[in-house]
């Protein structure tokens, strides 16, 4: 039967390998939604902290798919796990038990020390699930009247572009002309404990959700002790403390989770991106029974969430972080990278900031950060600007000392040469 099916399948169009970069750009422009503005580079291969374009040029990857490939591109352990599980069982839905989900649930809850995990797929799904859990807890446990729960977010947050996510956004690029928005959301300035306290005094507040380090805002770090202050305030006013660790977590900041820098234990933690090492969309919500067990069968779910392939990949991705000491490497290599970046002339780069391998530079506004990224690309390093004047540097956590030094040399030379020519 398969052979007869193959005979009727039409031949595929010309493969991407034989296309030039420009042909790839043109095809995407013609057939795809124009919801991204990528750097003009067409990638076809990745390994460790490097990627190659279709013409064979090699680049340092200093974006790491927005921290989804912390373990490095095409990690051999992840590749093996995917191949083995994909040949056995990939998806059952949650209509049935499978033999892998429980293994993953036990592993991830013991690793992060929470009672329960809710398995999802993407970061935005997991964040939205956290909001749902917080609302239900507010009604069932805190005693908020139905449909009156409020969730507070930090300004300049980013957790996706679903209707709920943009309802919490303060970035017009995300929310403008997409209303009406989800009610019951409020925002307060980031890194401002008084603003948090003023907002969560309201008896209807269910939760405060915050990124320990704001990624899309430009790797913005709060003052030391901010998260501890938030945690204390949430306890004082009986409000759930949620950390969005989708981008900042899993070693990126030099700690397994970024909120570990402040020695806090949030009520809910959201994970994603590097939870699969770039092989598969996997996300998770972690919390204790007093929050998680308010959700009953049929009240929340996901066809793909907790599937066998995702679970095996997530276990392997977390094992790699520990076995290869990538969290520790992030801390050491991050210090090295930051020390190099801080040698950039202050009249060109006004600010260098970061933790671990989660770094950013702020370019003088008279220079165009997008054009700097184009020059970096020409010189063999890929990075992406955000908010016009900020360039993020976040390579895979497997990068070594020699590679950091080579990459830093590219950055320093590119930025200084660009300033001289402009």
Curated annotation (Swiss-Prot):
One of its GO terms (cellular component) is mitochondrial matrix. It catalyses: a 2-oxocarboxylate + L-ornithine = L-glutamate 5-semialdehyde + an L-alpha-amino acid. It comes from the Eukaryota. Its cofactor is pyridoxal 5'-phosphate. Pfam families: Aminotran_3. GO terms for biological process: arginine catabolic process to glutamate; arginine catabolic process to proline via ornithine; L-proline biosynthetic process. The modification N6-(pyridoxal phosphate)lysine is found at residue 273. GO terms for molecular function: identical protein binding; ornithine aminotransferase activity; pyridoxal phosphate binding. Pathway: Amino-acid biosynthesis; L-proline biosynthesis; L-glutamate 5-semialdehyde from L-ornithine: step 1/1. Keywords: Aminotransferase, Mitochondrion, Pyridoxal phosphate, Transferase, Transit peptide. It is an enzyme of class 2 (transferase). InterPro entries: Aminotrans_3, Aminotrans_3_PPA_site, Class-III_PLP-dep_AT, Orn_aminotrans, PyrdxlP-dep_Trfase, PyrdxlP-dep_Trfase_major, PyrdxlP-dep_Trfase_small. It is found in: Mitochondrion matrix. Its EC number is 2.6.1.13. PANTHER family: AMINOTRANSFERASE CLASS III (PTHR11986), ORNITHINE AMINOTRANSFERASE, MITOCHONDRIAL (PTHR11986:SF18). Belongs to the class-III pyridoxal-phosphate-dependent aminotransferase family. This is Probable ornithine aminotransferase, mitochondrial. It comes from Caenorhabditis elegans.
């Amino acid at each position: 039967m398969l052979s007869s099916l193959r005979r009727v399948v039409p031949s595929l169009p010309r493969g991407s390998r034989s296309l030039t970069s420009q042909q790839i750009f043109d095809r995407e422009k013609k057939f795809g939604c124009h919801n991204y503005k990528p750097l003009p580079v067409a990638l076809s291969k990745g390994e460790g902290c490097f990627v190659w374009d279709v013409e064979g040029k090699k680049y340092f990857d200093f974006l790491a798919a927005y921290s989804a490939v912390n373990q490095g591109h095409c990690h051999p352990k992840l590749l093996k796990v995917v191949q083995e599980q994909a040949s056995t069982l990939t998806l059952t839905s949650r209509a049935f038990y499978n033999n892998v989900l429980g293994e993953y649930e036990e592993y991830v809850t013991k690793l992060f020390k929470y009672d329960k995990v809710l398995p999802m797929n993407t970061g935005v799904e997991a964040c939205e699930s956290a909001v749902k859990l917080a609302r239900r807890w507010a009604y069932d446990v805190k005693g908020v009247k139905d449909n009156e729960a409020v969730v507070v977010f930090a300004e300049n947050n980013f957790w996706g572009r679903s209707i709920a996510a943009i309802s919490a956004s303060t970035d017009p690029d995300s929310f403008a002309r997409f209303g009406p928005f989800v009610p019951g959301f409020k925002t307060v300035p980031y890194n401002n404990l008084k603003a948090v306290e003023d907002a969560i005094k309201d008896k209807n507040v269910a939760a405060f959700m915050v990124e320990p380090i704001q990624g899309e805002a430009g790797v913005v770090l709060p003052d030391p002790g901010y998260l501890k202050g938030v945690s204390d305030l949430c306890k004082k006013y009986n409000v759930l403390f949620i950390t969005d660790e989708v981008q900042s977590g899993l070693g990126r900041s030099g700690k397994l989770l970024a909120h570990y820098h402040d020695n806090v234990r949030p009520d809910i933690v959201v994970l994603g991106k590097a939870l699969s090492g770039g092989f598969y969309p996997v996300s998770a919500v972690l919390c204790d029974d007093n929050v998680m067990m308010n959700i009953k069968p049929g009240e929340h779910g996901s066809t793909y969430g907790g599937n066998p392939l995702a679970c095996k990949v997530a276990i392997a991705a977390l094992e790699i972080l520990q076995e290869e000491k990538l969290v520790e490497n992030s801390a050491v290599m991050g210090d090295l990278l930051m020390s190099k970046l801080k040698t950039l002339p202050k009249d060109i780069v006004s600010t260098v900031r970061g933790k671990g391998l989660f770094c950013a530079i702020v370019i003088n506004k008279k220079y165009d950060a997008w054009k700097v990224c184009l020059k970096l690309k020409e010189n063999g390093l890929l990075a992406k600007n955000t908010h016009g004047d900020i360039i993020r540097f976040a390579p895979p956590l497997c990068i070594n000392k020699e590679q950091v030094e080579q990459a830093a040399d590219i950055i320093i030379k590119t930025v200084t040469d660009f300033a001289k020519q402009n």
